[in-house]
Structures are given as structure tokens and as C-alpha cells.
């Protein structure tokens, strides 16, 4: 625990095109080696493809995808009397969003399409339709939490 109190969390600026902080966080997640311009091109290109394929506003589809990807419960290892239990706990809202964005980017990188724009667009569309690898990861996490519900009283 820090002696000087808690560090203030810095707030990200909303992105210039969609005026949305979550989109900025997605850009920061996609970014590799500090190349923000490249990351912006990827995200904005993917959003154009999403709007084109779905016929809806790209930010609406993205928000829907995020809601389908963000986990509500996760398990945390807790050691009690020599045994380690997987204890289900609720996920804080900021961590929920961070995990959702991380999974979206991770699974879009693993997809088979040719360009990252296509991969990200595909993963966003799949997540909005409640399919895709990122949604599967969330469901697996919820299944783990459900299976270990008996240890919920070990929460701290």
C-alpha cells in the first residue's frame, strides 16, 4: 500500500472524430510502439467498415459489442489453509471496460483476415452479434465464476 495516498487517475481525451472516450481507449489499446496515427487509421477504418456492413452508426455497434464483451464476474485465487480456491468476485466498472477492450484487440489480432482493419471490424461485428472469440472469453470467465460459486463466502 502506498504511504502517500492514492494516485489520481488521468482521464483520456475524447477522440476528435466520434467524440467518445471509449474509442480513444480502443485506439490506445491498438497502438503498438507509440504509433498513434497508425492506430487511429486502423480504428477509424474499422469503424467505417462496421457502419458499411451493419447499416447502423459505428459507435452504436461498438457500444453494443462492448456491452457483450465486458465481464461482470471473474475469479481470483485466494489461499486459505494450504488450499487455493478460485473465488468469484464482481469486476469493477473501469476494469470491466479495460478487459473488454483488451480482449477485443487481442482476438482481432488473432483473426485470419488480411488487414488489421478487417480483423477489428470483424471482431466488433461478431461481438455485437454476441458471437466471436472475445464474447466466448467472457462466457468462459462467467462459467468459471458460476462453477466456483460455493467459494463466494471467501470474498475479501
UniProtKB/Swiss-Prot annotation:
Keywords assigned by UniProt, alphabetized: Ribonucleoprotein, Ribosomal protein, RNA-binding, rRNA-binding, tRNA-binding
SUPFAM superfamilies: Ribosomal protein S7 (SSF47973)
Pfam family, one: Ribosomal_S7
Source organism superkingdom: Bacteria
Any single GO BP term: translation
GO CC, alphabetical: small ribosomal subunit
Alphabetized GO MF terms: rRNA binding; structural constituent of ribosome; tRNA binding
Functional summary from the UniProt entry: One of the primary rRNA binding proteins, it binds directly to 16S rRNA where it nucleates assembly of the head domain of the 30S subunit. Is located at the subunit interface close to the decoding center, probably blocks exit of the E-site tRNA.
Assembly and oligomerization: Part of the 30S ribosomal subunit. Contacts proteins S9 and S11.
UniProt record similarity statement: Belongs to the universal ribosomal protein uS7 family.
Protein name: Small ribosomal subunit protein uS7
Organism: Lachnoclostridium phytofermentans (strain ATCC 700394 / DSM 18823 / ISDg) (Clostridium phytofermentans)
Amino acid at each position: 500500500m502506498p504511504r502517500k495516498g492514492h494516485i489520481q487517475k488521468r482521464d483520456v481525451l475524447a477522440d476528435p472524430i466520434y467524440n467518445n472516450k471509449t474509442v480513444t481507449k480502443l485506439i490506445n489499446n491498438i497502438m503498438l510502439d507509440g504509433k498513434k496515427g497508425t492506430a487511429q487509421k486502423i480504428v477509424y477504418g474499422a469503424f467505417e467498415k462496421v457502419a458499411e456492413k451493419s447499416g447502423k452508426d459505428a459507435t452504436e455497434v461498438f457500444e453494443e459489442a462492448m456491452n457483450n464483451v465486458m465481464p461482470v464476474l471473474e475469479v481470483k485465487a485466494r489461499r486459505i489453509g494450504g488450499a487455493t480456491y478460485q473465488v468469484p468476485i464482481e469486476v469493477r466498472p473501469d476494469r470491466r471496460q479495460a478487459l473488454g477492450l483488451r480482449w477485443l484487440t487481442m482476438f482481432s489480432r488473432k483473426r485470419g483476415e488480411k488487414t488489421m482493419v478487417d480483423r477489428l471490424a470483424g471482431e466488433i461485428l461478431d461481438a455485437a452479434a454476441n458471437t466471436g472469440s472475445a464474447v466466448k472469453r467472457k462466457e468462459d470467465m462467467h462459467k468459471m465464476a458460476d462453477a466456483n460459486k460455493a467459494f463466494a463466502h471467501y470474498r475479501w
